[in-house]
Amino acid sequence: MSLLGTKYIMEGDFFIEYFSNAGITTIVPEPDEQVELQRIIYEELTRGIVLADSRTSFLTVAEHCRRKGGDVVGLCCTEFGLLVDESTSAFPVIDSTRAHVRALLAWR
C-alpha cells in the first residue's frame, strides 16, 4: 500500500503499524517527495488552492510509490481528496476521510 499524507503520518508509525499488523506492506514516498507533499498540503490545499502542477506532482509521487509495490494509494490526509477522487482515479485509491465516514455510517 502507498501511504501518502503529512510528513508526520508518512514518518510515524500510526498507520504503518496497523497495516503491518494486518500483513500489509507500506510504501512511503522518498524524503524529497515527502517535502513536496507537505508543501502542497500547507501552502496550497489548506488554503483552498488547488493547482494543476501540484496535482501532477501528487500523481507523480503516487505513481513512484506504486512502482515500488504500493498497489493501492492511501490518501491519509484530509486535503488530498482535493487532488484525486477515489471514484474517478486511474489507479486504486482509498481516501481515509471517506473511509472513516463509511465506517461510521455502517456502525449506525
Q: What are the language-model segments listed below?
A:
Residues S2-R108:
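Non-catalytic structural scaffold of enzyme domains
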